[in-house]
Design a protein with these regions (language model features):
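Asp-based, Mg2+/Mn2+-dependent phosphohydrolase catalytic module
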Residues: 1-10, 109, 115-227
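N-terminal helical cap/lid subdomain that shapes the substrate entry/recognition surface
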Residues: 3-102, 124, 128
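Surface-exposed charge patches
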Residues: 31, 74, 106, 160, ...
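Hydrophobic, well-structured mid-protein blocks that either form specific transmembrane helices
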Residues: 95-111, 117-120
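Generic recognition of short, well-ordered alpha-helical interface segments
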Residues: 66-71, 106, 156, 215
Length: 227
């Protein structure tokens, strides 16, 4: 399906699209591991973090802060770093220090002049509140995992967004970096979606193409707001 000709509502995934969570997680792990003289390999950390977090999120719902604590302990164990569970709070405590990508705020300001905006985030309300202090532009809608009690790729975020924006659904575009978490459920729900493919990930056989694919959030902005 093509992008709507008259886009009115634009939503974003937050972490990975607006916020550089990979750097934030790596720096948090390394800072805590420094206490034990342990070195973290970022290239090993990030894929294991994604895999383990996704597994935990697929179980019974719990607040994202708890997901992070559990993920921290399991990832550390796999890396050979003996982290006691009592120290795992370092990871949710680091979320307020996860910073936006360089182009994020300039693009949000441009979007805000033309569209209504929202965030659909796999996070709890408290942690997103801390993150929003780094983001410019007013939001017309926020849907968190805490509100719908599930994590993407479960479709609850997108169903709730569609319910709230009502008649604007046909003029809604979602922008996200996560293919499994955001692109696939959008395609299933027939929501126009722009994939911010920062790592030049190649689609696997059987995976459907997004409505549009770009390399950065800035390029996504040019697609919707070329002026």
């Amino acid at each position: 399906m093509p992008l709507p000709k008259d886009v009115q509502f634009v939503t974003f995934d937050c972490y990975g699209t607006l916020i550089d969570w990979e750097t934030g997680v790596y720096e948090a792990f390394q800072k805590e591991a420094d206490r034990d003289g342990f070195t973290i390999d970022r290239d090993v950390l990030v894929p294991r973090f994604i895999e383990i977090q996704r597994e935990i999120q697929s179980g019974s719902y719990e607040l994202y802060a708890e997901v992070l604590r559990r993920t921290a302990v399991r990832v550390a164990e796999e890396l050979g770093w003996p982290l006691e569970s009592s120290r795992a709070q370092f990871l949710p405590n680091s979320v307020p220090r996860w910073m936006p990508f360089r182009e994020t705020n300039a693009q949000l300001e441009r979007f805000a002049k033309k569209f209504e905006m929202g965030i659909l985030a796999n996070v709890d309300d408290k942690l997103l509140g801390a993150t929003r202090r780094h983001l410019r532009g007013d939001l017309d809608l926020v849907v968190t995992a805490q509100q719908v009690r599930s994590y993407k790729p479960d479709p609850a975020h997108f169903r709730e967004c569609a319910r709230r924006i009502e008649k604007k659904k046909s003029k809604w575009v979602h922008i996200a970096s996560g293919y499994p978490t955001d692109i696939e459920p959008c395609l299933q729900a027939k929501v126009a979606v722009i994939w911010v493919n920062r790592h030049a990930t190649e689609l696997e056989p059987g995976q459907r193409k997004p409505t549009e694919e770009v390399k950065s959030f800035r390029e996504a902005g040019k697609l919707l707001n070329p002026a």
